[in-house]
């Protein structure tokens, strides 16, 4: 389970996916499978959470990694490149953004 902690020195990645309600569940299932079967087993993975809005038009993925390079290496694996091509067909687009924890209240 992700924990947002002041002083976390790892890499936080928040990815938003935009889709239609017609593809929302299929996309969520693909993301859940990717985490269960591949991502959580990658070096440097700390934790992640998947969230869907009530209109089923957006998914937000919050993930934590020990280092930026660990996240980038996961994206470059053959398995994730193949999975991301499929994921891309189920959404209008997705955008991963790297963040640093600045404050926790």
Per-region residue spans from a language model:
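Short, well-ordered beta-strand segments in beta-rich or mixed alpha/beta enzyme
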Residues: 11-18, 47-77
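Alpha-helical interaction segments
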Residues: 24-25, 35, 52-55, 60-62, ...
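Short, surface-exposed ligand-recognition loops at beta-strand->loop->(often short) alpha-helix junctions
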Residues: 18-31
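Glycine-rich beta-strand-turn "strand-cap" elements at beta-sheet edges
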Residues: 1-11, 18, 49-56, 84-105
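Residue-level signal for secondary-structure boundary sites
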Residues: 23-25, 69-71, 104
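An amphipathic, aromatic/His-enriched active-site/gating alpha helix that lines ligand/cofactor pockets
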Residues: 34-37, 41-46, 64-98
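Residue-level signal for functionally critical sites in structured catalytic/ligand-binding pockets
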Residues: 13-15, 27, 42
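Acidic-enriched, low-complexity/disordered segments with a strong bias for Aspartate over Glutamate
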Residues: 6, 26-29, 54, 70
